[in-house]
């Protein structure tokens, strides 16, 4: 499956880059006119999260053997979904490198590097696909996070839609991010004798990295959206740090990444 998986990942890379190109040809909300690149990037990320997160949830529901045997038990199409996600993270990483400064995106790039390394193991070996499918459940929470950022970008906070999205982000963070991360950590600990040491190390680093980022992000959303009377615009001390860099096609671009921010 390795050659097919690589072809799928390559096609996915081109498809998500093409989607970004197509979104640039569509009207951008007037309120997000100053942050058009960020709007396009978030829309592409939302599309991937909905596709991969929903696919992982349906797949694990229809084929529970993927959770029972995360190493060997999986249908053929599950590996295709994992390869699609590899292509997306490579495309998003290229987009970040092209449009934002390294100082503003190093955390996201490190996150993407770890994720691509882990998912690529399943694509190249044909094993650990069930484990990868469980990890894609995190994208259900990512979909809420991307929608929340889009609402912030379009100046829809505070609003009922933003409040619902904030609560949904916290709920899915617990259910579809922290729970799967805990399950994967426990499985890796119990089955470490069946997994090569290099993969145990890689998986452990990935789980710790994403886990820390997830907890910090959850605390920030809880404080900014729930405990405070109203959400504040992004600032250096909050979830996002804004800076500008000249985009290669036209006009300035506003970056939206800060230390330990999360976008998967």
Swiss-Prot record:
GO terms for biological process: membrane assembly; phospholipid homeostasis; plasma membrane organization; regulation of membrane lipid distribution. It is found in: Cell membrane. The chain crosses the membrane at residues 3-23, 42-62, 77-97, 114-134, 169-189, 199-219. Belongs to the TLCD family. Its main location: membrane. It is a multi-pass membrane protein. Signal peptide: none annotated. Keywords: Cell membrane, Membrane, Transmembrane, Transmembrane helix. This is TLC domain-containing protein 2. PROSITE patterns: TLC. Residues 252-264 have a biased composition (Polar residues). InterPro entries: TLC-dom (IPR006634), TLCD (IPR050846). Residues 237-250 have a biased composition (Basic and acidic residues).
């Amino acid at each position: 499956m390795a050659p097919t998986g690589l072809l799928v990942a390559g096609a996915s890379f081109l498809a998500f880059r093409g989607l970004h190109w197509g979104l640039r040809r569509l009207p951008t909300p007037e309120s997000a006119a100053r942050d058009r690149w960020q709007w396009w990037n978030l829309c592409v990320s939302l599309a991937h999260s909905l596709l991969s997160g929903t696919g992982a949830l349906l797949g694990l529901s229809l084929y529970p053997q993927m959770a029972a045997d995360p190493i060997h038990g999986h249908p053929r199409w599950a590996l295709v979904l994992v390869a699609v996600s590899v292509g997306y993270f490579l495309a998003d990483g290229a987009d970040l490198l092209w449009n934002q400064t390294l100082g503003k995106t190093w955390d996201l790039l490190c996150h993407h590097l770890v994720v691509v390394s882990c998912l690529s193991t399943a694509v190249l070996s044909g094993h650990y696909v069930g484990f990868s499918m469980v990890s894609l459940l995190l994208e259900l929470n990512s979909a809420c996070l991307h929608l929340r950022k889009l609402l912030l970008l379009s100046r829809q906070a505070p609003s009922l839609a933003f409040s619902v999205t904030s609560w949904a982000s916290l709920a899915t963070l617990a259910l579809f991010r922290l729970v799967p991360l805990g399950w994967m950590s426990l499985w890796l600990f119990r089955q470490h004798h069946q997994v090569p040491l290099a993969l145990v190390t890689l998986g452990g680093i990935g789980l710790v990295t994403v886990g820390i980022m997830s907890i910090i992000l959850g605390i920030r959303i809880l404080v900014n959206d729930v405990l405070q009377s109203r959400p504040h615009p992004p600032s250096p001390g909050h979830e996002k740090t804004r800076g500008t860099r000249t985009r290669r096609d036209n006009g300035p671009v506003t970056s939206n990444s800060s230390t330990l921010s999360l976008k998967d």
